[in-house]
Every structure is written in structure tokens, then in C-alpha cells.
Amino acid sequence: MRRYLIPPEALRAVPPGGRRQRPGQARSAAAPHGLLRGHWLLRSTRRGGWLGACLLALAAPLAQAEALWLDDAGRPRAATREAVRWLTDAEQQGLRPQDYDASRLASAVADAELAAPSPDAAAQLDESLTRQVLAYLSDLRHGRVDPARIQARYDSATAPAPDLPTVLREAVAQGQLQDAQRAALPPWPQYADLQKALVHYRSLADHPAWGKALPALPGGKLQAGQRWAGLTTLAERLQALGDLPEAPATAVTAYDATLQKAVQSFQSRHALPADGVIGKSTLDALAVPPAARVQQIALAMERLRLTPLPAAPRFVTVNVPEFTLRAFRNDAGSVREDLQMRVIVGKALDTRTPLFDEDMLWIEFSPYWNIPPSIARKETVPTLRRNPGYLAAQGMEFVSASGVSTDVTPQNLDAVMAGQMRIRQRPGPRNALGDIKFMLPNNQNIYLHHTPSPGLFSRTRRDFSHGCVRIEEPVALAQWVLHDQPEWTEARIRQSMGRPRPVTAKLLEPVPVLMLYQTAVVDGGKLHFVPDVYGQDAVLEKALKQPRPAPAATVTPVTRVPAAPQPVPARAGASDSIAAQ
């Protein structure tokens, strides 16, 4: 079910009977308030302007409110300096101060502390600061970009999102401004860990360990006991990154066991074989400057903002570039990881696993594999034309409305190519799905399943599938999913995986499954970086660089509630579609 992050107050903008207003129809009091102008949600055409009307209804009460930041004399209130610090320090949250006119507002507030501005200038300053603080809180909670522009679609039901204007007003009134920021933070536990890592890596910007390049390796690689001119610099970098407990007191002359252990820690955090040998890949990873890692962490934080935390008591995530599945328990917002395993995802070249979410509804043991028509036409039929014996060797058969056939004839092959027949693989040891699949119905035919080739899980990079997700420990996941059905014991699960015919177990409650894309992850208290195998970080980075509506260049008087609708400026390059949050 699609859902949109709209506060209850805004929903009251829907006319009786739920009819959605068309753009330009009469609305409630206000035109687009400054805090909403240019927001991608407002520019929707697919939903007939209904969502825009809801947001406008939310803006009007805020526009009519008393000044938040200035007292009756036009002087800044106690919370004003803290609000300005949020904007000027936005980089600490992976955001950009220039997006919130931080420098100009900081100067204006400093001037107002020295001398009260005119009433018109005070009104403009208060409105501008309110607009930018709310933009900051909204970006902090929901992200800066339309998810559709980064090829992601998430529809899972979530807990109600905070009404940020109300939260802000109450926080200012109670003298607890920090409550507003806490309410706006994304609910993913991972977010706080990434934010701490971001602050640390930002502190390394001018660290002397990156002041000079590491020299070439002797013989192309460095092993235990060898000498190398870069050892002291290596030790300094590893210490700064947290892999080496403390930097050596004296110059390092040999690659000893302490340094080797630190390198193994570094390698395991950077998706490299943790063998302690420094080769080209490890040297390249060591050469990445902290600023590049800061950007990588910031992109991971942005993706968490764009990804809804499911309200369901249990959910599963697959982090595609990390090749990792995690199963979580959600107890009223307190999220705990129960299970983690390696996975294989779609090939980066041509069969990428899409980024979306869907509910798992049942498990099928000993499944048939109904070969997708595209795979049958491109791969299976050409193979059968060359080697008709391949059908029997792989336990396959032709299926049509008239029945099942195992005859590899030109007529049957032509029927498959024409879409009049399909090929399926019977349950058994050669079945491409292994002996179990976890069904999450979707129009992309993506699901989780086992594999007859478990040896691939030992690879560091694991993008080998046609798009579905192959899981390493299917029994453990089945037990976790069926936890509320005690009759499904481990023995019964394993027995069902060896049947000659499919066996189905329906879930009592749907389990959301989310396909994520995080190249920076905190796992077990350690920050891990993984390669951008699908190039999606570059896509998000490009979207974030798109211009936003320009802030006012000068301080001018404003009307708090405009009397007539004003055009909403479109953000350059943005999509007109609404993506469900």
C-alpha cells in the first residue's frame, strides 16, 4: 500500500468525500508558503495536486503564527543562536549549509543582537529563519531528493512521521529546541552510528598522515617482516582510522605483527580479503582521502532518510552492494538485529537487483523454477538447440495449457520463443532456486531463494544472479520468519526442502523486505566501506547537486499570508512524479 508522509492537519485539506483538488482550484487561505516552495512533493501532477493542497494547508497556520525567533522588540530569542548553529553546522549531518542560507542568516541574527531591526526586516528575518529551519528539519527526516530520481521505490507502512512545524513550535515554546532536531532524525539505528563516523572522518581533513603519498610497494606487495619506506605513514593512517590502537612512539622499520593485525582490520572494513598482505587493492584503499569517505558516509545517511523504517514487528533488509541480508525485530521503534548472512545479488552489468520493498507472504519449499521468458529466450532455448540433452540433465520440462512435455523438438522451442510455452525446472538438487524460496509478490519477479552453488558465497564480490537474491542460510531465515508457527520445526523445514513436490508455508503476518543500497555501513560498532558496484552513489550525488530554489538575495518586507496563489518554481532536473516515502 502506498503511503505519503503527511501530517494529520494536512489531511483535513481533502474535501468531503475525498475528491482531490486540481491545480489552480480554490484552496484554503494561503498560497505556497516560502518553506514549501520548490519542494518536489508540491510539483506533483500525477496526483492531481491533492498532495500539494495538503502541504499548503499545513503551511497556512505556520505563516499566521507569532514570531518564533525574535521577541516583540525584534531581538533574537534564546533558541535563535542554536537554530542558526544547526544550519551553519549542517555538514555534521551530511547536509549543506548553503542550502539553508546559513551564512546570511547567521550574519542577520548577529546584527539583530547588536541593534533591533525595523519591523519589516524583523518579520522577514523571522520568516526566513523559520523557512530554513523547517527545510533543514524536513531534509534531515525525509531527505533532499525525490526517491524516484535515484531509482528507488519504497512503500512499506511506517509509524506516523512527526509534524515538524508543530514539533518546532512546541520545542521553541518550551525552551527545548534540541527536541525538534531529535524528532526529525531518521528512525534507523544505523543513522546515529553513521553520523558519529561522519564527524570523525571530517576531523581527519587536515591530518598529517595524509600529507604525503604512500610510496610504491617493494615487489608489488608487502608481507610480514619486510621493510618499506611508507611504514610510519601507514601506522599513522591506521591509528587515525581506528584500526591501530595507538601510533608507534618511534619510526617503524619493519612490517611487524602489530601492523599486520591493524591492516587485517582495515581490510575487513573495506571489503578486501583480510590476509594482512598489502597489495594494490589495499594500497588503493589506504590512499583514499578522508574527504572522499566523508562524502560516502553522507550519501549513506541520505539514503537512510529516503528509506522508510517499517512499522512491522519484523522486517528484512538486503544491502545490495554489501551482499548482506539482515533480519530485524522492531519493538515499538526499538530495532534489534536478529540475523545476518551473506547473499548473492544481480549482476552489475545487465541484471541488477532493483531497489524496492515488498511484503514476504509465504515460503515455498522444494519449488519449481519457472524460467523467466527473457532468460528462456536468451539462454535456455539457444542452449537446448545446441544440446537437446541439457533439458533432461537439468531436470527441466516444457509446460503449456495442454500439459507437460520433455521432448526437445523444434516446435516446442519455437513455442517458447513465441510465448506459447514455458520451461520450468523440477524440484531437486539441480534446481536453480535451491530447495526453498521466500515469496514477496512483485511485478519485477524478484524474491529470495537458496542456490545449488553455495561455493559462490565465499567470494568477496557476489553479483552473479539474474536479479533475485540468493541467501546463504535458508534454514535460519525460514526459522526466523516462521517463529510464530511452532509446528514448523527445523526438522520439518529441512524435510520439506527435500520433497519431490512443492510445499507452501503461509506467513501469519507479512514481513517487509527492503532492498537497500548503502556503501558505508556500521556493523558491530565498526565502520565498513564497500564498493559502489552499481554506480548508485554517483546517481545520488548527481541528484543532490541539482540546484534548489535560490534564497532571497536581499532583506525585504513580506506579507505573512499571501492573498493570492503564487507560482511554485520547479527545481531544475527534478521529476514530476511522486515517489512514495
Walk through the language-model features, giving the residues of each.
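N-terminal secretory signal peptides that target proteins for export/translocation
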Residues: 1-44
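Well-ordered beta-sheet/strand-loop patches within structured domains
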Residues: 2, 154-162, 169-581
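Sec-dependent N-terminal signal peptides
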Residues: 46-55
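N-terminal signal peptide c-region/cleavage motif recognized by signal peptidases
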Residues: 59-62
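Cationic-aromatic interfacial patches
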Residues: 65-160
